[in-house]
């Protein structure tokens, strides 16, 4: 669990923003959402494979861009 120390005369909004940034950096919320419901191993593999395929096609698309004609 990320913790922050609130400095003297520090506004609450600034401390809250620092805390949110620390939580996001640790990946706590994404892990919590992933573990909220049980996911069968086959479903997890299928989802990860689909994400990998999507990343692959996205990478290929970005490499095959035509040259810009100004």
UniProtKB/Swiss-Prot annotation:
GO terms for molecular function: structural constituent of ribosome. Gene3D superfamilies: Ribosomal protein S8. Keywords: Ribonucleoprotein, Ribosomal protein. Signal peptide: none annotated. It comes from the Bacteria. GO terms for biological process: translation. Transmembrane segments: none annotated. It holds the Pfam family Ribosomal_S21. One of its GO terms (cellular component) is ribosome. Belongs to the bacterial ribosomal protein bS21 family. NCBIfam families: S21p. PANTHER family: MITOCHONDRIAL 28S RIBOSOMAL PROTEIN S21, SMALL RIBOSOMAL SUBUNIT PROTEIN BS21. This is Small ribosomal subunit protein bS21. It comes from Chromobacterium violaceum (strain ATCC 12472 / DSM 30191 / JCM 1249 / CCUG 213 / NBRC 12614 / NCIMB 9131 / NCTC 9757 / MK). The lineage of its organism: Bacteria, Pseudomonadati, Pseudomonadota, Betaproteobacteria, Neisseriales. The gene is rpsU.
């Amino acid at each position: 669990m990320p913790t922050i120390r609130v400095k003297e005369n520090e506004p609450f909004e600034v401390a809250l923003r620092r805390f949110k940034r620390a939580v996001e950096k640790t990946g706590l919320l994404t892990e919590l959402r992933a573990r909220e419901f049980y996911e069968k191993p086959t479903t997890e593999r299928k989802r990860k494979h689909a994400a990998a395929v999507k990343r692959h096609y996205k990478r290929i698309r970005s490499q095959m861009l035509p040259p810009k004609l100004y």
